[in-house]
């Protein structure tokens, strides 16, 4: 069967920028990238900007140009911000509500994290139930919120995000 037998189905778009030199308006760059990626997701969108460790963001239902008015985009533009991430969404899991828009920003005892995710967790419901039994309170219904809780839980247990990443992403040698 040819590759063209199945219709195209776009599922979200994710963008990230790190401007080491500090010469770019990372919020504007994220906006432009999301505008270009908008064909991959027209339900919701969002941008999170890291300004010297302080993460602020905006996300909502709607098209990029509707969600990011000049005033909203201006509030994210910081001359000292060097990082931003953005997301446009078509729901592949979870419902079409503002709480499922990304990036999700999580504040916890050791810092703040913004997370964008494209895809589905095959065991999301099982993980969600386990986390709820441990006290997690979910505000939306997306897999991304499950990932946020898992990363945060392990960050608090292990001390650094680098340790979490290394521990959980390192494949065993055979």
Predicted regions and their residues:
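Conserved short alpha-helical segments that host acidic/polar catalytic motifs at enzyme active sites
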Residues: 1-169
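A short, hydrophobic C-terminal helix/tail in secreted or cell-surface proteins
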Residues: 170-174
